[in-house]
Swiss-Prot record:
The keyword Transmembrane applies. It is a single-pass membrane protein. It is found in: Plastid, Chloroplast thylakoid membrane. Component of the cytochrome b6-f complex, which mediates electron transfer between photosystem II (PSII) and photosystem I (PSI), cyclic electron flow around PSI, and state transitions. PetG is required for either the stability or assembly of the cytochrome b6-f complex. This is Cytochrome b6-f complex subunit 5. The 4 large subunits of the cytochrome b6-f complex are cytochrome b6, subunit IV (17 kDa polypeptide, PetD), cytochrome f and the Rieske protein, while the 4 small subunits are PetG, PetL, PetM and PetN. The complex functions as a dimer. One of its GO terms (cellular component) is chloroplast thylakoid membrane. InterPro entries: Cyt_6/f_cplx_su5, Cyt_6/f_cplx_su5_sf. Belongs to the PetG family.
């Protein structure tokens, strides 16, 4: 079914996206305000 496939893709991508945002924010926090990105 298409719904099952889409739900599986969403459930797989959401944790990866949240982890990526968390890691990016953590790295920027560690660097401080030295680099203005």
């Amino acid at each position: 079914m298409v719904e099952t496939l889409l739900s599986g893709i969403v459930l797989g991508l959401v944790p990866i996206t949240l982890a990526g945002l968390f890691v990016t924010a953590y790295l920027q926090y560690r660097r401080g305000d030295r680099l203005d990105i």
